[in-house]
Amino acid sequence: MNKSDSINEITTIIKGIFLAFENHNPDEIEMYMHPDATVWDVFTPHLIRGKHERDKFHADDQEQMQARGPLKLNIEEPEVDIWSDFAIAKYYLHYEYQSPNPTKGSVRITDIFYQVNKAWTIVHHHEGSVPEGVPKIES
């Protein structure tokens, strides 16, 4: 697989994961995750480790998602760097939940991929809120 094909595959995986999220299908998300993968979620204060913790996280995440209201997602084109069988994808995700419990924001995401048997799998997914600048300093 050449570099361009790998970048296209990784980009397709990322878009597929968020489409699965919108469609309430965590099993499809898990198809792309290494069994030992870790997750820093933007709304979760602790590191999520491995498949067992991710299953609980998915259940809780789907519950809060469905309680909020309809969701709109916009993913910016990922920037992907590849080194042999490792890759890092960096991108922005913009989300907006509608009523009855609206909220919106932007998240910067880094995914670390590892190639196993010629297929890319996520070994770490990291989300962080996009800062709005340096906080004001009171004098």
PLM region spans:
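Hydrophobic/aromatic beta-strand elements that line small-molecule binding cavities or substrate pockets
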Residues: 75-80, 93-95, 108-114
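Short, low-complexity N-terminal intrinsically disordered segments enriched in polar/charged residues
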Residues: 1-35, 134-139
